Regions:
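N-terminal membrane-sensor/transducer module of prokaryotic signaling receptors
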Residues: 2-152
Length: 152
């Protein structure tokens, strides 16, 4: 019975982890959340938007924390992180994935040259405690780089 239930949940794009169920997020969901965040910065200003992005119970943390907005500046300093407030104020410029890839540097470079983009890297999925590929969409707004990622 349990295997049939898990199979049925998998068919509907859901994850079951430690007794919790939620719909798996898509790259389109991540991009839409970044677009919504960019609109808030433009409409309300940087300070108000950053406060909202850092609100772990706010509109920019979704699907039980699977989707959240993070913001870095051009130097790699974290200005907002809806999932981990301990990162705010920390410089993540030299952060690498398990394969040694400097994915934050890549985001900064692409944002500076193209204004927006995607980057893929391996990261620990806290929900499953496994290393997985993650794809992050980001956009540059003034001196901010606003991003949101999903596990593949």
């Amino acid at each position: 019975m349990a295997r049939a239930t898990l199979a049925a949940l998998a068919l509907f794009g859901s994850l079951v982890v430690h007794g919790m169920t939620w719909a798996a997020s898509t790259p389109e969901d991540a991009k839409a959340l970044v677009k919504k965040a960019v609109a808030l910065v433009k409409a309300s200003g940087k300070d108000k938007a950053l406060a909202e992005f850092n609100n772990s119970k706010g509109a920019f943390v979704q699907n039980n924390g699977e989707l959240y907005i993070f913001v870095i500046d051009q130097a790699g300093k974290t200005l907002a992180n809806g999932a981990n407030s301990k990162l705010v104020g920390k410089n993540v410029h030299d952060l690498r994935d398990v394969d040694g890839r400097y994915f934050i540097r890549e985001m900064i470079d692409i944002a500076g040259s193209k204004g927006e983009g995607w980057t893929d890297y391996k990261w620990n999925n806290a929900a499953t405690n496994t290393m997985q590929m993650k794809s992050t969409y980001f956009e540059k707004v003034d001196d901010l780089i606003i991003g949101c990622g999903v596990y593949k």
